[in-house]
């Protein structure tokens, strides 16, 4: 599998599927599956038994994983979806991610 360009905490745009056009923050990246959990995206209803956290149990809405190919990173400069590139940093030791549309470095 190729390198994933999305990391936890990034703001992403959904480019296909039921939630197309929405944006959200990445909560978790599932590297082996090539999927990510995004805040408020791909919500599913899940039945839960009563427990200490939820004494009544019942139906709970929560995020389900969405495939990385359906996500684009949001450019920090323009606020629009963009592709991501990697280039050497100024010290020459590490790589940094950058937005292909604006050239802006992604923190």
From Swiss-Prot:
Pfam families recorded: KOW, ribosomal_L24
Keyword RNA-binding: yes
Highest rank taxon of the organism: Bacteria
GO terms (BP aspect): translation
UniProt keyword Ribonucleoprotein present: yes
Annotated region described as Disordered, given as residue ranges: 73-92
InterPro entries (alphabetical): KOW, Rib_uL2_dom2, Ribosomal_uL24, Ribosomal_uL24_KOW, Translation_prot_SH3-like_sf
GO MF entries: rRNA binding; structural constituent of ribosome
Family annotation (Gene3D superfamilies): 2.30.30.30
A GO CC term attached to the entry: ribonucleoprotein complex
Signal peptide (residue range): none
UniProt KW keywords: Ribonucleoprotein, Ribosomal protein, RNA-binding, rRNA-binding
HAMAP family found in the cross-reference section: Ribosomal_uL24_B
Assembly and oligomerization: Part of the 50S ribosomal subunit.
Role according to the record: One of two assembly initiator proteins, it binds directly to the 5'-end of the 23S rRNA, where it nucleates assembly of the 50S subunit. One of the proteins that surrounds the polypeptide exit tunnel on the outside of the subunit.
Family: Belongs to the universal ribosomal protein uL24 family.
Name of the protein described by the UniProt record: Large ribosomal subunit protein uL24
Organism: Phocaeicola vulgatus (strain ATCC 8482 / DSM 1447 / JCM 5826 / CCUG 4940 / NBRC 14291 / NCTC 11154)
